[in-house]
Regions:
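Conserved phosphate- and dinucleotide-binding cores of soluble alpha/beta proteins
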Residues: 2-11, 15-18, 28-228
């Protein structure tokens, strides 16, 4: 969501107009709609009062249900029409699996929202994250919990470079030709660890307290009770 501010500046400067934006909507996206960056908003959740006022008064700001937004059972889910999605992460591993359910120690932070749905549906899924937070590397050998599988992640963007999923060699070439700093994800991991050191691996935990399923019901991972 914070990326919307910078995306608006680029779209206005380059005269780029999108068909629609979707997801949880904030005032930033409302401003982009009003300034002509998008033709419409497909809103599954208003995140601030500016979005609430817009959905009440602007006929181009459409309310949609969670099923319309992301259900694989829907005939035409909105996520399947996304060209690009920008997503965050608490952890990313070298297989491009992404964790948004827990922190690095395994403590549950919340639900994943439409993270895995949009990553699977969009033509290009981008994970935007700093290389480390609070001296903990974001890129690791294996995420604590797989929220979104690496097969659905195309690009990881950090302040030290852009890693492209090896399954997308054509995309890597196009981004490199565009002058972007393409870096192997293993190299990004090493850069982070040279700055922060290699973190201790937290204990695995006890009984299973949650099961993580993909959008079509496939078991992805489990979350275990923390041991103290």
């Amino acid at each position: 969501l914070p990326a919307a501010k910078f995306l608006k500046e680029i779209m206005l400067r380059e005269k780029i107009r999108g068909s629609f934006a979707s997801g949880g909507v904030t005032g930033y996206l409302v401003d982009m709609l009003n300034e002509g960056c998008f033709t419409s908003l497909m809103d599954v959740q208003c995140f601030d009062l500016k979005a609430v006022e817009s959905i009440r008064t602007n006929p181009a700001h459409h309310e949609i249900s969670a099923m319309q937004y992301a259900s694989p059972a829907a005939k035409s889910a909105v996520v399947d029409h996304l060209d690009v999605v920008l997503l965050g992460a608490t952890e990313i591993d070298t297989d491009f699996n992404v964790n948004v359910h827990t922190d690095s120690a395994g403590c549950i932070m919340g639900g994943s929202g439409g993270h895995s749905d949009t990553a699977a549906g969009a033509k290009l899924s981008m994970i935007i994250a700093p290389l480390f937070r609070a001296r903990l590397p974001i890129i690791t050998g294996r995420v604590r919990c797989i929220s979104t599988p690496g097969r659905d992640v195309d690009v990881v963007v950090t302040q030290r470079g852009v890693a492209v999923n090896p399954a997308k060699p054509d995309l890597a070439l196009r981004l490199k030709d565009a002058g972007l700093p393409i870096v192997d994800i293993h190299e990004l991991k090493q850069i982070a660890e040279r700055i922060t050191g290699v973190p201790a691996v937290p204990p695995e935990g006890g009984r299973v307290v949650a099961r993580v399923l993909s959008r079509d019901g496939e078991p992805l991972d489990v979350i275990r009770q923390l041991t103290r």
